[in-house]
């Protein structure tokens, strides 16, 4: 850059700083790059698939999927993990369906959880914005976008047409709160439902509610699906769950994680640790027996996971080893995910032979 351009740029930067304050325009090289802080989801496999060890703070996240796929369970798991780190969390329950007893079983400290059950969509989003601007909240969950009913629709008659009202409401609210979320370093999670587009001949007919604004503003979008049942004998005790990272602005997207959600207990973390520890050589598997550092810890995955539950020090050590190996730059976690699924299938077959 020649001297005249340098002087012109310096004058422009000086004027901008006087008018808008110091730091309005910065050179990216002036400050060291910092890793994006993350909050664990409670699922080790999903934390690895997200690439940074969890959901990013200071960003908007959308979690969507069919009914009973585990959307609320996943967000309550995030809240439980955040509270363990001393974070303050809020739950905007637009669906009026939050069960405090179930949340407590998942590890949520319900006494400290802030809960709002707003009457209208405008009220829900205004409360969310005020909580963000307080700079005192670390995690806010809005359950769900589909239940954010505009005031005009509530006050109108049942058969009235209100085309695009909810989409305009979401677009306006997201424009308003996005900057505040970044400044407050607050994680805001929107739960969303799936609808079907009529007359789609090619491609997926599925879409999410509330228009397109949330798709653009969200830094991470997670598609959660129930893929099967977890059984003990003939009794169904949980769900096999697959989460696909369909959008990710903080790490490579399109990775996926598979884990189990046990009814009344939440995400089966110890089972994930056993699978990943075997995959990466921290735990040895011979037939149906699992061994750690030369000593047997259990026959079958369920018994090995129970051993980890009874020995939290070993469980934490294994989890740390896995995170240190897979959450370092240069690790191809997409390839890891496909290998993990293949190994999990092999182990399931071996356990079934017990």
UniProtKB/Swiss-Prot annotation:
One GO term (biological process): SOS response
InterPro entries: AAA+_ATPase (IPR003593), DNA_recomb/repair_RecA (IPR013765), DNA_recomb/repair_RecA_CS (IPR020584), P-loop_NTPase (IPR027417), RecA-like_C (IPR049261), RecA-like_N (IPR049428), RecA_ATP-bd (IPR020588), RecA_C_sf (IPR023400)
Pfam families per the UniProt record, alphabetical: RecA (PF00154), RecA_C (PF21096)
Entry keyword set: ATP-binding, Cytoplasm, DNA damage, DNA recombination, DNA repair, DNA-binding, Nucleotide-binding, SOS response
Compartments it resides in: Cytoplasm
GO MF: ATP binding; ATP hydrolysis activity; ATP-dependent DNA damage sensor activity; damaged DNA binding; single-stranded DNA binding
GO CC entries: cytosol
Binding-site residues for ATP, renumbered to this chain: 65-72
Stored HAMAP family: RecA
Family from the record: Belongs to the RecA family.
Function: Can catalyze the hydrolysis of ATP in the presence of single-stranded DNA, the ATP-dependent uptake of single-stranded DNA by duplex DNA, and the ATP-dependent hybridization of homologous single-stranded DNAs. It interacts with LexA causing its activation and leading to its autocatalytic cleavage.
Designated name of the protein: Protein RecA
């Amino acid at each position: 850059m020649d001297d005249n351009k340098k002087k012109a740029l310096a004058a422009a930067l000086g004027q901008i700083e006087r008018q808008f304050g110091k730091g309005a325009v910065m050179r990216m090289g002036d400050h060291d790059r910092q890793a994006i802080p993350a909050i664990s989801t409670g699922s080790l496999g999903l934390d690895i698939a997200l690439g940074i060890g969890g959901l990013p703070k200071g960003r908007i996240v959308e979690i969507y999927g069919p009914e009973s796929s585990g959307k609320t369970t996943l967000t309550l798991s995030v809240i439980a993990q955040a509270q363990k780190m001393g974070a303050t969390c809020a739950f905007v329950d637009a669906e009026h369906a939050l069960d405090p007893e179930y949340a407590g079983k998942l590890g949520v400290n319900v006494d400290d959880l802030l809960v709002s059950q707003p009457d209208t969509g405008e009220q829900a989003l205004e409360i969310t914005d005020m909580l963000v601007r307080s700079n005192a909240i670390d995690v806010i969950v809005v359950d769900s976008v589909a239940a954010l009913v505009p005031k005009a629709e509530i006050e109108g008659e049942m058969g009235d047409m209100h085309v695009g009202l909810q989409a305009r409401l979401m677009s306006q609210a997201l424009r308003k709160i996005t900057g505040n979320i970044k400044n407050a370093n607050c994680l805001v999670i929107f739960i969303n439902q799936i609808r079907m587009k009529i007359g789609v001949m090619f491609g997926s007919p599925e879409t999410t509610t509330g228009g397109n604004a949330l798709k653009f503003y969200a830094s991470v979008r997670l598609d959660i699906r129930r893929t099967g049942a977890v059984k003990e004998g003939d009794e169904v005790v949980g769900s096999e769950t697959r989460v696909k990272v369909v959008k990710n602005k903080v790490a490579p997207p399109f990775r996926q994680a598979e884990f189990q959600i046990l009814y009344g207990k939440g995400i089966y973390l110890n089972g994930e640790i056993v699978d990943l520890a075997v995959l990466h050589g921290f735990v040895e598997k011979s037939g149906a027996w699992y061994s750690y550092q030369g000593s047997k810890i259990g026959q079958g995955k369920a018994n090995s996971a129970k051993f980890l539950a009874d020995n939290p020090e070993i469980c934490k050590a294994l989890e740390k080893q896995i995170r240190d190996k897979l959450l370092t730059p240069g690790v191809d976690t997409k390839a890891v995910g496909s290998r993990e699924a293949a190994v999990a299938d092999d182990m399931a077959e071996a356990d079934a032979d017990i």
